[in-house]
Amino acid sequence: IAAAVDIWARGPAALPPPRHPRTPVLPVEGERNVLITSALPYVNNVPHLGNIIGCVLSADTFARYCRLRNWNTLFVCGTDEYGTATETRALEEGLSPQELCDRYHAVHADVYAWFRISFDHFGRTTTPQQTRIAQDIFQRLLARGFLLQDTLEQLRCESCGRYLADRFVEGTCPFCGYAEARGDQCDKCGKLINAVELKNPQCKLCRGTPVVTPTQHLFLDLPKLEGRLEAWLERTWAAGDWTANARHITRTWLRDGLKPRCITRDLTWGTPVPLDGFRDKVGPTRRPCRALPAGLTCSGVALPQVFYVWFDAPIGYLSITANYTDQWERWWKNPQQ
């Protein structure tokens, strides 16, 4: 405050010269380097004020503040484009998932440009860089013994010849009896649901009745990381930067003990799992499925497994930066700066 008062009294001549950042913006030795992201907006709809106010606007305000302070600042964001929500919306609009992503990515970019959000780069997750980095992280986890394989019971539609992701199933909520509950959550009572728990389940693609079938999936072995995570959390909590709510939720997870977390899904739209036995896991259909538009054909085609969006999407922050600069690791693997 004293410095601000002093500069105010001395007038504009006392201000440091404005920074003229180079392109691309890269960390500079000896300076304060700030990397800012906001939550990646999902691509299957038109963004509304809640999206912008919820995360984008606050990040933009902070980015502008950092630049005014002459801090070396990079602000990146982009659309999150893989997963079942994209497939579902593509079905509704009669488009392939890629066509849907191309359409709504452009809409998002235009909206944020209209609001003058000061991104240095607004990218997307459906890129070769995303595939390369996500598969590299997967291979590193596999080589270090942090992955395991296990069987899940999952709903399979014999008519479509595919295992059904959570959002491709509707049925009656086992908790409140709501007749249009999704395979991941009930919109009436708000409880999370395992799709196989639904009563009277229906395939959203053909309205057929799916059957419970065992299927192999890959899991992140979180119990192996629990000890190291607890030690790291104690150090970071001591710094005082966590909100009370974030501390409470994290302590609850640790109190109950971490469980292995599934990182794969039987889908067509996502980053492929680069492991034999998961590249072409689902065999040909028994009869043609006419419910799918171009780009989502299932008849007679072997479907690969892809990474579950919760594993894949956070890597989008890295891949979007990598599409901005091939020196992205200087931002993401440089804790000293």
Give names to the regions the model predicted.
Residues 99, 104-120:
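A glycine-rich helix N-cap at a beta->alpha junction
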Residues 79-85, 89:
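Short, charge-patterned binding micro-sites
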Residues 122-130, 160:
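Conserved short loop/turn motifs at secondary-structure junctions
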Residues 144-219:
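Cys/His-rich short segments
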Residues 89-102:
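A charged helix-plus-loop insertion that forms the helical arch/lid used to bind
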Residues 1-77, 129-133, 176, 185, ...:
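Structured secondary-structure scaffolds
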Residues 45-52, 119, 123, 149:
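Histidine-centered catalytic micro-motifs
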